[in-house]
Every structure is written in C-alpha cells, then in structure tokens.
C-alpha cells in the first residue's frame, strides 16, 4: 500500500485554456477518497492522469513518495476498475482475473493462488470456469474488481464502476466495495457522478466543478458545511434551497429577492461577524431541515404548488419570490396544492454565502 499525492496538477490540451486548475490532494495510505461532480468537471481526466493514460501539463503525481509523471501505466503499481467491465469473452472468469499476471510472467501456481484468494473475497469460487456471457452485470463487475485485486497494487483507481448497473445492483455493489476496502485497506481513488456513491463509500470526498476542487472533506463535513454555493446545490438530493436576498439592518429578517417574503431570523444573526447586517446574501437551507413542527425554530409560510410522494417521505414544492423552494416531509404529511405550509427555519441549519464569490460566510 502507499500514499497518493497530487501537487498543483494542471491539464491543458491547447496550451492556453486549462481544464484542470492546480489540484492539490493527499490520499493517505489505505484511505478511500471519492471524486464527485457533474459531467465535464475534470474528475475522469484527473483519474486518467493518475493512471498514466493522460499526460500532466503541470504539477506532479507521487505514489509511495515516488514521482510517477513520466512512468508508463504498467510501471505505476496501480490497478483500474472501469465502467465497462472489459472482460475477454473467450476466457473464463479465472483466466480473465489472472491474465495480467500471466502477461507479467508470474508463475502459474502464484496466479492460481491469487485468483483463488480474490475469488473467495468476492464470492466468485463457483463461477471461476464460466464465461462472461454466463454472468449477470453484478457478477461481471465483481470479476473486474477481482482482476484488479490479484495484481496487489499500491493504489486502486475506480472510474464510475457502477454506472452500468441497475439501481438494485448499485446498492449491492456499494456494500461489496465497502466490505472489500475494509478487508484490503488499499489506497483508493474513486470517480463518480453519483453523490450517493460518494457519500456512502468515501472517507473523504473531493467535489469537482469546472476543473477546480471546490471542497475536500469528510462526507458529513461536505453535507453539513458546504464551502460554496455549488457544493450546497450539488450535494444532497434534492439540493439545498438557495435564496437570494438581503439581511435587514437590525438582523431580524431576511428579505427574499423577487418580492419574496421576509423570513424571520430570530436568534440567527448572531450569525457572527462574517455575515454583515444590511447587505445582500445568498441564504441556504436544506429541504430536510425545514420540516414543520420544530417548536423552538422560527417559521415562515410556503404555499404548496405540488407534492411528490416518494414512499418513505414526500417533497412539497412552492415558491418564495423568484426562487423554487422544496421541503422534505414525513410520509404521512401530504399537503394539497394551494395549502399554506408553516415551514421551520432553524438557526443551526441556515447557511450564508457571499453572492459575488459563492463562498461560505458563516
């Protein structure tokens, strides 16, 4: 195992415009770090640079303290698991898993030993003689992971490995990857656009946007204290409600822009010196923190436009001024369109962002 270090890593294709803007990341020995972001944010490009499939324009990448910028992928002691399983259709499961070792000249007994050990970890023993066409999608992905495990790499790289699976299989495979990391404790860098994968798998999350690492932190930190408006809107399903407006001169209310209501801030501003009174801010609050019935929190009225019934809970939708607002409600609470909903504004769950920079203020 080994630490993975990225220092001021940049990427440009034309020498003028950068698609990655100085990424600094330290992945500790045995740590599982997930890069998450929308399509085109640079996460897969960065992973390919770590793998050696893309050249680095500036900066350095080190594995186990050794700079690998100029090394070929085969010399970096890494193993990749892709979105596409990339299994040889004419080979058995065992042959697929051991093929890279065979090419590397590892003796047959050692290959068999490693393949059997990986098959036991992944519960593939009964499938070793089958061909890929005889396997389910989840089984094929386990074979792809087994092929990576037998190499005993310093670093695992995962490039959206669950994207081809249906929802049920994704849940199952997330659990299997968690168990796999708990058992092997191999340094891992995982790329996904799915925030659920990021939040459930990661020890730390890197939220990527337009070639920048917007925030790096534990899943709870990224959820509870988003560093930017982008992180607030991207992490969470649905994302945080973000309202443009102005804190009053006395700090008592937040006037929502676009002829929206004045939201009570009783006990809030004491928001601190960072959030000045009498100026414009972007106020954020998550749908799940607005549920009615919180007796000790200020409340405001939201007229319901529609309600989505999700099973375990419901989402009520309305508008304050020019802003769409979503509130997560318990399963039994199903307001009708036109109903006035008294939603909570608990002080500890209000987030203030600078409208110019998008950075967190409080």
Swiss-Prot record:
The keyword Transport applies. GO terms for cellular component: ATP-binding cassette (ABC) transporter complex, substrate-binding subunit-containing. It is found in: Cell inner membrane. It is a peripheral membrane protein. Keywords: ATP-binding, Cell inner membrane, Cell membrane, Membrane, Nucleotide-binding, Sugar transport, Translocase, Transport. ATP binds at residues 37-44. It catalyses: sn-glycerol 3-phosphate(out) + ATP + H2O = sn-glycerol 3-phosphate(in) + ADP + phosphate + H(+). Residues 4-235 form the ABC transporter domain. PROSITE patterns: ABC_TRANSPORTER_1, ABC_TRANSPORTER_2, UGPC. Its main location: membrane. SMART domains: AAA (SM00382). GO terms for molecular function: ABC-type glycerol-3-phosphate transporter activity; ATP binding; ATP hydrolysis activity. GO terms for biological process: carbohydrate transport; glycerophosphodiester transmembrane transport. Its EC number is 7.6.2.10. Transmembrane segments: none annotated. Gene3D superfamilies: 2.40.50.100, Nucleic acid-binding proteins, P-loop containing nucleotide triphosphate hydrolases. Belongs to the ABC transporter superfamily. sn-glycerol-3-phosphate importer (TC 3.A.1.1.3) family. The complex is composed of two ATP-binding proteins (UgpC), two transmembrane proteins (UgpA and UgpE) and a solute-binding protein (UgpB). Part of the ABC transporter complex UgpBAEC involved in sn-glycerol-3-phosphate (G3P) import. Responsible for energy coupling to the transport system. This is sn-glycerol-3-phosphate import ATP-binding protein UgpC. It comes from Paraburkholderia xenovorans (strain LB400).
């Amino acid at each position: 195992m080994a630490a993975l270090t990225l220092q001021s890593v940049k990427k440009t294709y034309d020498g003028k415009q950068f698609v990655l803007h100085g990424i600094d990341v330290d992945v500790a020995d045995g740590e599982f770090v997930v890069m998450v972001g929308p399509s085109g944010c640079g996460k897969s490009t960065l992973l390919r640079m770590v793998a050696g499939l893309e050249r680095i324009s500036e900066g350095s990448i080190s594995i186990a303290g050794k700079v690998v910028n100029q090394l070929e992928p085969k010399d970096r002691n890494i193993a990749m698991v892709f979105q596409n399983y990339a299994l040889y259709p004419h080979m058995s499961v065992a042959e697929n898993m051991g093929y890279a070792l065979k090419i590397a000249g590892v003796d047959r007994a050692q290959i068999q030993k490693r393949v059997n050990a990986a098959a036991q970890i992944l519960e593939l023993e009964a499938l070793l003689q089958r061909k890929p066409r005889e396997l389910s999608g989840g089984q094929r992905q386990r074979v792809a992971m087994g092929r990576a495990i037998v190499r005993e790499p310093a670093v695992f790289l995962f490039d959206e490995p669950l994207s081809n699976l249906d929802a049920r299989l994704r849940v199952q495979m997330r659990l299997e990857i968690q168990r796999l990391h708990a058992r092997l404790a191999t340094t891992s860098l995982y790329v996904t656009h799915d925030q659920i994968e990021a939040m459930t798998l990661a020890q730390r999350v890197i939220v990527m946007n337009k070639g920048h690492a917007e925030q790096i932190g534990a899943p709870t930190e990224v959820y509870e204290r988003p560093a930017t408006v982008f992180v607030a809107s991207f992490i969470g399903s649905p994302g945080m409600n973000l309202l443009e407006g102005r804190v009053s001169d006395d700090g008592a209310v937040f006037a929502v822009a676009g002829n929206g209501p004045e939201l009570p801030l009783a006990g809030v501003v004491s928001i601190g010196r960072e959030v000045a009174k009498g100026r414009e801010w972007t106020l954020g609050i998550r749908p799940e923190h607005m549920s009615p019935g919180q007796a000790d929190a200020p409340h405001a009225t939201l007229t319901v436009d529609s309600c989505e019934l999700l099973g375990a809970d419901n989402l009520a939708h309305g508008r304050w001024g020019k802003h769409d607002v979503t509130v997560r409600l318990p399963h039994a609470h199903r307001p009708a369109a036109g109903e006035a909903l008294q939603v909570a504004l608990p002080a500890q769950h209000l987030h203030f962002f600078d409208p110019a920079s998008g950075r967190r203020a409080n």
